[in-house]
Regions:
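Cross-family detector of peptidyl-prolyl cis-trans isomerase
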Residues: 2-5, 21-194
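C-terminal motif of bacterial Sec signal peptides marking the signal peptidase cleavage site
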Residues: 16-20
């Protein structure tokens, strides 16, 4: 009887030990990042193309031939949050006065997307935030493509495929193949003096 009790105790100990050693594999934040970003930008492109409420604008990346057929990764998708009252658009060589917030696509840890850059804290409030001045030609292609279509006072949520952002190499705080999401408020712009 004593040997049965010892055998039972040993068996249970081994089973409990094996159960506690069972591997649990949880998906990492950036696992399959390239594929997930491709699916994400394709879903944004489909929503923008459907344009159910007329509040989307789609722009082919600056410098690409409009006569050719391009994939989703060659366009910038802009959701118009608020239309401004300006009448002119900034040029590539202009400096822009803007409020902006840059994020990655939503993920498990960051449901609103990981914020990698911002000119303000908290929520966008054009009457409260202090805008920054940027040279438009020193931003990524997707950013300057979108901003060149904005007018003073516009507030847009801009979705930039990785090809028009930081590409496969990424940059500090932004892994390669990342879709970029910018909340942009164009306050004004200035032309260089000739």
């Amino acid at each position: 009887m004593k040997s049965i009790r010892i055998l039972f105790t040993l068996t249970m100990s081994v089973l409990l030990g094996l159960t506690s050693c069972e591997e649990t594999t949880e998906a990492g934040e950036f696992d399959n990042w390239k594929e997930r970003n491709t699916l994400y930008i394709n879903s944004i492109a489909a929503e923008a193309r459907a344009n159910t409420y007329g509040d989307w604008k789609i722009f082919l990346a600056e410098g690409l031939d409009t006569a050719k057929v391009w994939g989703n990764e060659n366009y910038v998708y802009c959701h118009v949050v608020k239309s401004g009252n300006g009448t002119e658009h900034p040029l590539f060589t202009d400096s822009v006065v803007i409020n902006y917030n840059g994020r990655l696509m939503p993920s498990k840890t960051y449901p609103d997307g990981y914020k990698f850059d911002s000119s303000y804290k908290g929520e966008l409030n054009p009457s409260f935030n202090v805008p920054v001045t940027l040279l438009l030609n020193e931003t990524v292609k997707g950013f300057y493509t979108a901003v060149q279509h904005m007018v003073d006072g516009d507030v847009w949520k801009v979705y930039i495929p990785s090809l028009l952002g930081y590409g496969e190499g990424g940059t500090t705080g932004v892994p390669g193949y990342s879709t970029l999401i910018f909340d942009i408020n164009l306050v004004s712009f200035h032309r260089p003096k000739k």
